[in-house]
């Protein structure tokens, strides 16, 4: 986004939605604004809970809201990244408004997760593809995407890591007013959204194992707007 802003040939419109706007997920749109990135529109999907029915209803709200914005600005292309379910409404809206879609990080595989179907659906709705490596590029072509529209550009997050000024342990301790133990474990748990109830049992097993690591500092990453995310969050909070 920052590189596009530097190029006078491009005019970008940033649309922010879903968990970025939710207070319980940290209202992370403020981080976008603090990076001096202008947000053109904030679209709330009004997600009331982590139940499948509420997530499904929020997609309908998204299609209506995105259609209104895209019809007004009618960009030359819509750029999306990844496999978040919230991308489907904007892709459907773009398709029906005859706006081409560019998709980053297609062709990947996450078995056991709804992300698998979502990602491949977005790829089939898209016109230009920017996968992260040659394996993913070949998979897109095998799915029927035109080879001359598939560009292996590598993982864009690598540039973010390379250019980011990383914090040292002491800075984190001061900021959060904590003291790390000598050994640290970083834990991320992603529910298998196809079988969410099974995932909760799996998380309980993980926590039972982690309970044995008394001499470690355990850092859990937060949840996103996924099925059963509230249950995951509650289990982790009770554990810590």
Q: Model-derived features: where do they sit?
A:
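Cofactor-binding loop segments of dinucleotide-utilizing enzymes, especially the Rossmann-like FAD-
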Residues: 16-19, 106, 155, 223-225
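Active-site and donor-binding regions of nucleotide-sugar-utilizing enzymes
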Residues: 1-5, 45-147
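A generic structural motif
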Residues: 7-13, 38, 213-218
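Donor-nucleotide binding loops and adjacent catalytic segments primarily
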Residues: 31-32, 65, 169-240
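Short, surface-exposed alpha-helical segments at coil->helix boundaries
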Residues: 25-30, 116-119, 230-234
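A nucleotide-sugar donor-handling region in carbohydrate enzymes
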Residues: 20-24, 126-201
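Structural beta-sheet core signal
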Residues: 14-16, 80, 103, 152, ...
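Conserved nucleotide-sugar phosphate-binding/catalytic loop shared by glycosyltransferases and other
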Residues: 11-58, 65
């Amino acid at each position: 986004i920052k590189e596009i802003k530097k190029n006078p040939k491009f005019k970008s419109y940033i649309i922010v939605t879903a968990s970025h706007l939710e207070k319980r997920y940290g209202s992370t749109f403020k981080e976008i604004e603090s990076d001096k990135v202008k947000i053109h529109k904030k679209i709330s999907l009004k997600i009331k809970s982590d139940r499948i029915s509420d997530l499904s209803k929020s997609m309908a709200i998204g299609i209506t809201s995105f259609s209104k914005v895209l019809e007004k600005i009618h960009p030359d292309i819509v750029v999306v990244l990844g496999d978040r379910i919230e991308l489907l409404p904007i892709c459907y809206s773009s398709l029906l408004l005859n706006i081409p879609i560019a998709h980053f990080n297609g062709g990947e595989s996450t078995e056991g997760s709804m992300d698998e179907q979502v990602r491949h659906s977005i790829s089939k709705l898209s016109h230009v593809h920017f996968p992260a490596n040659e394996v993913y590029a070949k998979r897109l072509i095998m799915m029927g995407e035109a080879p001359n529209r598939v560009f292996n550009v590598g993982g864009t997050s690598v540039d973010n890591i390379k250019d980011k000024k990383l914090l040292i342990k002491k800075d984190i301790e001061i900021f959060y007013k904590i003291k790390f133990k000598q050994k640290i474990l970083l834990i991320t748990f992603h529910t298998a959204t196809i079988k969410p109830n099974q995932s909760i049992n799996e998380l309980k097993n993980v926590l039972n194992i982690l309970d044995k690591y008394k001499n470690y500092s355990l850092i859990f990453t937060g949840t996103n707007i996924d099925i059963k995310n509230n249950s995951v969050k509650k289990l982790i909070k009770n554990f810590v």
